[in-house]
Amino acid sequence: MIKSARQLKDLIRNLSKNKSADAQILMRNYMMERFLERISLSEYRDKFILKGGMLVAAMVGLDARSTMDIDATVKGATVGIEEAENMIASIVSVPLDDGVEFRVKRISEIMDEAEYPGIRVSMETEFDGVVTPLKIDISTGDAITPREVRYSFKLMLEDRSIEIWAYNLETVLAEKLETVVSRATTNTRMRDFYDLHILSQLHGESIIPADLRAALIATARKRGTENYLADAPAAFDEIEADSNMEKLWRAYQKKFAYANDLSWHTVMESIRSLYGLTQ
């Protein structure tokens, strides 16, 4: 068990060198893991379903994807600000001998380009005097197809895993594919494009095409974008040919070293191949 900030910083410094990852991001990731373990031991362990960047990073490795927050959906419940407040209070009160304290700073409705309505919880953690900001986005009503899965989440600094519920691979891919198709050149989130590429490269053999097709249709139906799917090939051509999109990709490459060697064309070809599995 990590007992001091100095010990934690030393471990993270060494890991950042080995993984070529930013130490500040790794520190935040460690604190997100502390929250995730509390979820796994809480009364909400069967309602919280991990998705988003933290799940993708776990699937592909921290040296291939970084993330700054936790995305989750809550199953079988409507989550407003009051419900979220009660839920988070219960989770952070789970007793764990890790010395980490959580403080909720703000709870608000998500208004920024969200595919689903939800709640954003801004927190900070404190460990041996070190304060780290944390953000959790919680949604409800997501179309998980065919269903969520049990996921063994490997901890960053310990040789063990925690068992949580998570999106299945096909739903992770379907949500990002739908976003790429429906938003076309208005989607400035280059991580969607990168995630589709890296997941297809590292987990392509695990993809079940029928499940990916069903998940894509279910996601589009939920978001009211079914009519866009038939025009996906044209959308991909438009996206790849758009000079601003390629400029955004180059900026993403400069920011994240793990994307350095990936051409825009290579990424778009991966996305075309993924979409082809749904046909």
Language-model segments: which ranges?
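Structured mid-to-C-terminal alpha-helical surface segments
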Residues: 1-48, 57-66, 70-279
